[in-house]
Amino acid sequence: MYRKALALLVLLLSAGSGSLSPVQGEPVTNPGVEEPVPQPDSSRTGRSSTVGVGAVGVGLGDTERTTGLRLNWRNGQFQRANGVNLTLWTPYSVNLGDEDDLVDENGEFGGDAFVGTTNGIALGLLHFPRRIRGVGIGGFGPVAGTLQGVAVSGIVVATVEDLNGIAVGAGGAAAAGDINGIAVGGLAAGADGPGAGEGTGPDAGGTVNGIVVGGLGAVGNDMRGAGVSAGMVRVREGGTLKGLAVSAYNDINGRQVGLSIGLYNHARVLDGVQIGLLNVARNNPEWARILPILNLNL
């Protein structure tokens, strides 16, 4: 459900783009695995040419493979770019006015949206690479299958699978898999792994190995590292915090092993320290379950 929410966010960002006609591409069943892209017919791709030798040089338009500089509007037959890939808009397989083009048969974000791998620098307004190895920069966002490197966006950075590296989004940074590294979102940052909760914000969940920073919320199913937010840090039921949580409201619905600092701290199982105006540790003796200023179980 978190993936569907990402799809809806993309639809909102694309308001007014209904003039883009849908063209169905081959489904991407596993964005984390590079698969050969079938040769599409001319109605599903844009024109292309390469200035150089073979696939090395400057690729203009919807080239399949380019080593060097690739300049393009939208992707259809694109498979791989080594170097700098500037693709301004979404693939031909995606009509942003139709949610069905952004979700798969299970209603989760993905579907036909992801095309090609960039090894190097991926640039665009709103682009959907299957994989980024290197740097991704977008106006509305790089929304990728997987990320290995650094991504920066004026709105959102999101991955359908794991986010490995650093992601910074003015609106948010999210992974529908795990976050291994650092994710910073102006509003929220979090991970939504298999078996996680539904929705966004406090209802998202996944595994965070590193640091997540969100203006209103930082969430995960498990956190090994740190969660920081002006609003809430949440670890879902059955999850574990191993490290640090700093926010106004730290809600650890599993086991806390480490330190939480906030106005209100809550832990189902505390094996660490809480510092705040009010501290709740449900596994403590009755007299020590709710304490001001400091609570601990070591």
Walk through the language-model features, giving the residues of each:
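Boundary at the C-terminal end of the N-terminal hydrophobic targeting segment
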Residues: 20-25
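Bacterial N-terminal signal peptides
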Residues: 7-17
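Bacterial N-terminal signal peptides that target proteins for export
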Residues: 1-7
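Surface-exposed, glycine- and small/polar-enriched segments that build interaction surfaces at terminal
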Residues: 26-298
